[in-house]
Amino acid sequence: MMAKLMITVMMVLLLSLQQGADGRSERWRKNQMAASSIMRNLITARIDPPRYCNHIICYEDSECSQWCTAGCNSITSKCDTL
């Protein structure tokens, strides 16, 4: 998870450094908008564990499986945590 965050931050920094002229300013503006969107998603990312998760996807979804320490309840599809 930490490595994923570091890669994303590095990508945002690289996108912000791609300033250009001679017709590349439109691409730079789009990259800036994408970088802003990525950072906004990182800042507003949910900290709480997911409340519900499909018991089949629970074991396949890395975000869900990191919170479902006690497994997923197959009847209610609720993510059980210890």
UniProtKB/Swiss-Prot annotation:
Cysteine disulfide links: 53-68, 58-72, 64-79
GO molecular function: toxin activity
Protein location: Secreted
Propeptide, chain numbering: 24-50
Entry comment describing in which tissues the protein is expressed: Expressed by the venom duct.
Classification via InterPro entries: Toxin_Pg
Single GO cellular component term: extracellular region
Keyword Nucleotide-binding applies: no
Free-text note regarding domains: The cysteine framework is IX (C-C-C-C-C-C).
Similarity section: Belongs to the Pg turripeptide superfamily.
Name of the featured protein: Turripeptide IX-23
Lineage per the UniProt record: Eukaryota, Metazoa, Spiralia, Lophotrochozoa, Mollusca
